[in-house]
């Protein structure tokens, strides 16, 4: 506050400029003291008289151009807090933060005469006891963090959970997992060349069986292989394939039977030369004959009924024709009779 009350030599009022620079004085421009001192021959610039008393003004030729000896009022010492801490730039560039030891910011020693009240006020507001200093972090690499995981800095952000392991490489073909007993797998692998998968089957009670992304087409179709997704069921095996692998079918006792086996169980195999087959065929033939005879009888009955209805219709038509002829003759008779007979017949 003393700096505002007591005039600083930098802010002392200068002698009034010539009339050419009067507009600059109104716009709050001041002349630099060192430039005016050079203009007056190395002596200090004389103090300007009050505004009501006009004083001598230096000539225009001694001051030179306008831009060299003029400057605006600088309010930066009053607006920028002197004690505000400055955060240092990060030292290392990497992926994680590491707390760096912060050195205390040097506080300039303020004298009693030139102590700035506004600077002290701003320093209390922005960098004082009410504001906490922001943490300063450097960077540390992930490799160094993984190597020295146990001896981390107290301020370092350690991950809450360990990073997940990298995913396994994707398989080339889609596989549908299936399980089968390990002893069956061992039996199959014993006869096959290269028992690489036998070790896997020996370690587990059930070995993993994979259906590849293609399946065999039934023998009736016109192709050998057909691609299908893993969600589609496997194709129906042909009878030749079912007979080719009896040992494998015996191993899969817990699995559902093949559709061909279900059909064979449902349909009995009967010898055509046996008496039972002959009796059954005779019974079937008799039943077919009876049904055919019944159909013929129904057909004959229908035809007979149609004939009866046709004859009745003809009789009715003949009767209608007869009645119509009678009506016409009676009408003609009534037309030929004289009027007196008609009048007498009317009275009767």
From Swiss-Prot:
Q: Which residues are glycosylated?
A: 228-229
Q: Where is this region: Basic motif?
A: 278-298
In-chain residues carrying the UniProt-annotated modification Phosphoserine:
232, 291, 328
The UniProt annotation puts the region (Required for MYC transcriptional repression) at: 24-135
One family from Pfam that matches here is bZIP_2
| Positions with biased composition (Low complexity) | 219-259
> Which processes are annotated in GO (biological process)?
cell differentiation; defense response to bacterium; DNA-templated transcription; hepatocyte proliferation; liver regeneration; negative regulation of T cell proliferation; negative regulation of transcription by RNA polymerase II; ovarian follicle development
Residue span(s) of domain bZIP? 274-337
Supply the alphabetized keyword list: Acetylation, Activator, Cytoplasm, Differentiation, DNA-binding, Glycoprotein, Isopeptide bond, Methylation, Nucleus, Phosphoprotein, Transcription, Transcription regulation, Ubl conjugation
Q: Where is this cross-link: Glycyl lysine isopeptide (Lys-Gly) (interchain with G-Cter in SUMO)?
A: 174
**Annotated region (Disordered), positions in chain:** 44-65, 79-112, 158-178, 219-277
Query: A cellular component term (GO) from this record?
Result: cytoplasm
MF (Gene Ontology) = DNA binding; DNA-binding transcription factor activity, RNA polymerase II-specific; DNA-binding transcription repressor activity, RNA polymerase II-specific; protein homodimerization activity; RNA polymerase II cis-regulatory region sequence-specific DNA binding
Localization: Nucleus; Cytoplasm
CDD domains in UniProt: bZIP_CEBPB
Q: Where is this region: Required for Lys-174 sumoylation?
A: 1-24
- Compositionally biased region (Pro residues): 47-59, 160-171
Q: Which residues carry this modification: N6-acetyllysine?
A: 43, 129, 132-133
The segments labelled Leucine-zipper in the record are: 300-307
| Basic and acidic residues: bias regions | 268-277
Listed under subunit, the entry gives: Binds DNA as a homodimer and as a heterodimer. Interacts with ATF4. Binds DNA as a heterodimer with ATF4. Interacts with MYB; within the complex, MYB and CEBPB bind to different promoter regions. Can form stable heterodimers with CEBPA, CEBPD and CEBPG. Interacts with SIX1. Interacts with TRIM28 and PTGES2. Interacts with PRDM16. Interacts with CCDC85B. Forms a complex with THOC5. Interacts with ZNF638; this interaction increases transcriptional activation. Interacts with CIDEA and CIDEC; these interactions increase transcriptional activation of a subset of CEBPB downstream target genes.
Q: Which family does it belong to?
A: Belongs to the bZIP family. C/EBP subfamily.
Query: What job does the chain carry out?
Result: Important transcription factor regulating the expression of genes involved in immune and inflammatory responses. Also plays a significant role in adipogenesis, as well as in the gluconeogenic pathway, liver regeneration, and hematopoiesis. The consensus recognition site is 5'-T[TG]NNGNAA[TG]-3'. Its functional capacity is governed by protein interactions and post-translational protein modifications. During early embryogenesis, plays essential and redundant roles with CEBPA.
Query: What PANTHER family does the record tag this protein with?
Result: CCAAT/ENHANCER BINDING PROTEIN, CCAAT_ENHANCER-BINDING PROTEIN BETA
Q: By what name is this protein known?
A: CCAAT/enhancer-binding protein beta
User: Which species?
Assistant: Bos taurus
